[in-house]
Amino acid sequence: PGAARGPGLDAGLRRLAEVGSATGLPLLTDVHEPVQCARAAEVVDVLQIPAFLCRQTDLVEAAGATGRVVNIKKGQWMAPEEMAAAVDKARAAGAAGVTVTERGTFFGYGNLVVDMRSFARIRAATGVPAIFDGTHSVQRPGQADGASGGDPEHIPSLVRASVAAGCDGLFIETHPEPSRAPSDATNMLPLARLGPLLDEVMQLRAVVASGSSGEGA
């Protein structure tokens, strides 16, 4: 019981470096303590502040001070407008860029809902891109023997809705066999379904952009 832990900072960064070398893709990882930021910035392109830590000033400033892009997840208890302070701190510290990610709002105990107005409100309040986390938004916090449960069947519909509502990007956790993933197994999208879903939402995004009045993607 309980949530799985990662391999540790050194081993984790080695694995990320291997992924970057093999794929040539930009890398993103969470950081949980200020002391981790400079080390992680040697390997990854984007430092991500977890939602529960988005008000930790020392962490946000340390991430920004690396000069990397900083993605800050909105706390599940926070209004979109409240993210402006965290964005300002990351910018002032020297971040190359900042984004804010919507990942749902507490709706009672052990449940999250997504307010699709959040993307426009985040942009208006912060002036930075608003990202949608389509997988953590279906979490059921603390519902699986001390770890998070989830409702992954809702991932595709929420992703489609977020693109229609004008989000600027997507964060999606995926795995070839989610049931075998050491963490977040109950709120991942199977890898085989990722490509078709992205094809679908890119078409949707084009439709939204063609009729956009300047709000959103």
Question: Can you name each region flagged by the protein language model?
Answer:
Residues 1-10, 174-188:
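Glycine-rich, proline-tolerant flexible connector loops at the mouths of alpha/beta enzymes
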Residues 1-7, 26-30, 50-51, 108-109, ...:
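Active-site mouth loops of central-metabolism enzymes
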Residues 1-48, 56-59:
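N-terminal active-site wall of soluble small-molecule enzyme domains
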Residues 11, 53-58, 82-85, 114-115:
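Active-site glycine-rich loop that binds ribose-phosphate moieties when present
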Residues 14-21, 64, 87-91, 120-124, ...:
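Surface-exposed amphipathic alpha-helices with a cationic face
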Residues 24-33, 45-58, 69-80, 98-104:
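Catalytic beta/alpha-barrel core
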Residues 66-174:
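Catalytic alpha/beta core domains of metabolic enzymes, predominantly
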Residues 177-210:
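C-terminal helical cap(s) of enzyme catalytic domains, especially alpha/beta-barrels
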